[in-house]
């Protein structure tokens, strides 16, 4: 991991105009995903091992430091900010960070503050999230079958997630459902998941499993190309391509029979790198310029080097010079190893 090597005086000069962030390929960086914790109250089999070793709490940035970092990114042109984890809502006092970041939505400097959650804590926090300016959230749900849900999450309770859906929608928050497509697990269930989501006014986005982190099972056995899933769905549904966008990588279709939207995120079969507008920040202050590569920049050192944001802003600029054109994801069937060694819960899903 690289740390910023420039001088403080140089940093002050660089940041006077708060110039928008643009990578070497001309892509404007307007979307920041922030993993506020690597901890989670589920242990989804495709995401992490059951007996995970989590980061020591002393290594985490404080919530105040995360707020400062996010605010610098917003000053530099970020318009959408997503809190992730792990499970973001299990971090102690997380709502203080959400409330502080909400001031940017209120002032108009941030278009959207949102989060991705497993739904387990939504019933507790939905009303407060809405009060802080959160208008949309993504909830991860791979099956509607209670027994299979317990199997895939190991620790999860689907009834709590359903209560979370109710609470979020009652609070006026728009919910999008995310489902990881898993061969021979939930592929036959996708029509039911789609009808469930669309029946409640929610979009559904399906995601190809990504080769990140060591897990107990062989993820190649579960890999399902979404081109195959789409072909299966088109036997019974009319899928009409849509130009609808949310600022993320999903490509959407409208399902004629339900009237709802269905999104596809395809990092393996059809990558979305050419339009990448995002970077990812971890709870330790590490900036990943690409989800599918291990190159990273240490922003914690720059953050703590000075009370001025100049040094930090210059460190961000230096990191963005290394943002690659595309990721290195590949399902390695020969060596049975992940393309990226870190878990998604560390990077932020």
Curated annotation (Swiss-Prot):
Binds 2 [4Fe-4S] clusters. Binds 1 [4Fe-4S] cluster coordinated with 3 cysteines and an exchangeable S-adenosyl-L-methionine and 1 [4Fe-4S] cluster coordinated with 3 cysteines and the GTP-derived substrate. Residues 24-249 form the Radical SAM core domain. It comes from the Bacteria. [4Fe-4S] cluster 1 binds at residues 40, 44, 47. It catalyses: GTP + AH2 + S-adenosyl-L-methionine = (8S)-3',8-cyclo-7,8-dihydroguanosine 5'-triphosphate + 5'-deoxyadenosine + L-methionine + A + H(+). Monomer and homodimer. This is GTP 3',8-cyclase. It comes from Agrobacterium fabrum (strain C58 / ATCC 33970). The gene is moaA.
